[in-house]
Amino acid sequence: MAALPASLADLEWIISRLAQRRALLTPLAPIFWRPASDASERHRAFIEHLLTEGGGLAYRTADSVLVASPRGDGWLVDDLHVRDGRWTPDGIELWNALAADRGGQDVRFVCPTYERDRAAFASSIGLTVAETWWLIELGTGGGEARLDVALPGARAITVGAPPVYAPPGPMLFLPSPENAATAVPAALDQAPELGCAGVVVNQVASDQELVETLRAAGLRPHCDYFTGTIKTF
């Protein structure tokens, strides 16, 4: 089956496929990706809104699905599940269907670092890593999201999870540390006091010096963000 546009008639099928992917990811970061008790219902509401009022696009094959969300002047591709690793032909067919509708536009492609085949696919369609989120999960929680936190060497914010996930607290997120050598240890000290369930640090691809600081502090690469232009392959 070649990739075709998906519609609300496919909604239950889409949610079931995306739930399969969520089940694969959860053990890899069980705090960050702890699913909400009603994760499928929440995901259904989000996808339904996206396809009706949110300007989103969806495509499917017999077993695989891609959902693209508008993002600024381009698109975000996060909800993409290819069954049994069939990036060829399913992944290519889904991507080409998106390219037929939105070719030439910018895209941000979400790729957890644990999904190596997904990363290889992203590279094969001409995308490159722009940023990486580094993560350390903590055993704390109960904090409040959307708090600005001043750290020595960085500005941070407590960030709540997307609705489908329910970690015990927000993540303390450092989007652009100016002095990681002081900011990261301070973040690790303050995160439990703030009731955060983890610390996430954004590393732009060009900042390789930051990598050693993050590794030494116990963080691991968690999610790559590829960027590029949508085009046919």
Model-predicted regions and their roles:
Residues 2-26, 144-154:
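A short beta-loop-alpha structural element at the N-terminal edge
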Residues 23-45:
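Conserved GNAT-fold acetyl-CoA-binding loop/helix
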Residues 41-62, 129-130, 143-149:
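A short helix-loop-beta-strand connector motif used in the catalytic cores of GNAT acetyltransferases and
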Residues 55-71, 152-163:
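Conserved beta-strand in the GNAT
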Residues 71-86, 166-180:
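Conserved acetyl-CoA binding element of GNAT-fold acetyltransferases
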Residues 90-106, 128, 182-197:
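Conserved acyl-CoA
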Residues 94-98, 108-118, 176-177, 200-209, ...:
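Conserved beta-strand-loop-alpha-helix junction that forms the acyl-donor binding cleft
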Residues 113-131, 205-222:
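Conserved active-site alpha-helix within GNAT-family acetyltransferase domains
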